[in-house]
Amino acid sequence: MVPSLALVPGEPAGIGPELCIRLAQQPRSDAHLIAYADPDTLHSAAKALCLSVRLLDPDQHARLPGDLPLHPVRQAAPTRFGTPDPANAAAVIAGLLGAAGDCLSGKLQGIVTGPVHKAVINAGGIAYTGTTELLAAQAGCPVVMMLANSIVRVALVTTHLPLRAVPEAITAEALARCLRITATAMQRDFGLEHPRIAVLGLNPHAGEDGLLGREELDVIIPVLDQLRSEGMQLIGPLPADTAFLPQKLTDFDAVVAMYHDQGLPVLKYSGFEQAVNITLGLPYPRVAVDHGTALELAGRGVADPSSLLAATALCARLAARS
């Protein structure tokens, strides 16, 4: 069965809408896409790109270039590309939660999301730290943020936290939960029966036997030992500065980093254009672009759709497996 996927552009004033229009120019055989967006915004994006778009009823299938089934999500204010309006924050969140709700009900089999501007959502009066956290709260389940490209997959124990808050957040419970969710996803979603997972230390040189910090000795190593006794293939804790050497990456199926900026700079340097953001642990596949709203590019027709193309292709594969 060909899966039906929600396509949510994110911040309407950013590049998300025009990327969706570009995606609609290439009819797919691997998925049926349904946009959850404001129709006027999509028409404006198509006009800015000098491309055609034909918005269909959500139960219709795209057959021609420019066809895009639409579940309309009306905005409170018109879109001005490059100038976000907090009045539209509720529509952005409604699009995300509506699409995810249809996945939870079984109506859809996955969701592809564009970039969201956190500050604009909060300025609109909605407490929001990220789409990963939003969808986890809706589904009522723990999740893990993983970013991936063709070279490496990186899962995060902590996500959007100030650096000073990270050590306290690295608990045995949090680390074990992240590793279990990551291992299960590698098996279920990526078909790896015995995934090999590298685990980074928190401190420089992975703590150097306690000289540079005790988190490795007190938290990380005991958790790894316990999970190894249960059969998980875990390597580490490894010093982060050498874990990503090309000759080492072939030994791992995924890397678990302790915090956001520990693991993601290397991934983005190695292939930012093709990188995607995967939410592990949800009852449906969710894959997002790995870039921001790029307000300075919006409406100019120069935004690179590579990440959205990669996210859609991966979401279709994951949905077909589930």
From Swiss-Prot:
Pathway assignment: Cofactor biosynthesis; pyridoxine 5'-phosphate biosynthesis; pyridoxine 5'-phosphate from D-erythrose 4-phosphate: step 4/5
Compartment list: Cytoplasm
Superkingdom of origin: Bacteria
Residues involved in substrate binding: T132, K268, N277, R286
Residues involved in a divalent metal cation binding: H160, H205, H260
Record keywords, A-Z: Cobalt, Cytoplasm, Magnesium, Metal-binding, NAD, NADP, Oxidoreductase, Pyridoxine biosynthesis, Zinc
GO cellular component: cytoplasm
Reported cofactor(s): Zn(2+); Mg(2+); Co(2+)
Any Pfam family hit: PdxA
The protein's enzyme class: oxidoreductase
Keyword NAD: yes
Details of cofactor binding: Binds 1 divalent metal cation per subunit. Can use ions such as Zn(2+), Mg(2+) or Co(2+).
GO BP annotation list: pyridoxal phosphate biosynthetic process; pyridoxine biosynthetic process
An example Gene Ontology molecular-function term: zinc ion binding
EC number: 1.1.1.262
Reaction equations catalysed: 4-(phosphooxy)-L-threonine + NAD(+) = 3-amino-2-oxopropyl phosphate + CO2 + NADH
Purpose: Catalyzes the NAD(P)-dependent oxidation of 4-(phosphooxy)-L-threonine (HTP) into 2-amino-3-oxo-4-(phosphooxy)butyric acid which spontaneously decarboxylates to form 3-amino-2-oxopropyl phosphate (AHAP).
Family: Belongs to the PdxA family.
Additional remark text: The active site is located at the dimer interface.
PANTHER family the UniProt entry points to: 4-HYDROXYTHREONINE-4-PHOSPHATE DEHYDROGENASE (PTHR30004:SF5)
Subunit structure and binding partners: Homodimer.
Xref: NCBIfam families: pdxA
Name the record gives this protein: 4-hydroxythreonine-4-phosphate dehydrogenase
Source organism of the structure: Xanthomonas campestris pv. campestris (strain ATCC 33913 / DSM 3586 / NCPPB 528 / LMG 568 / P 25)
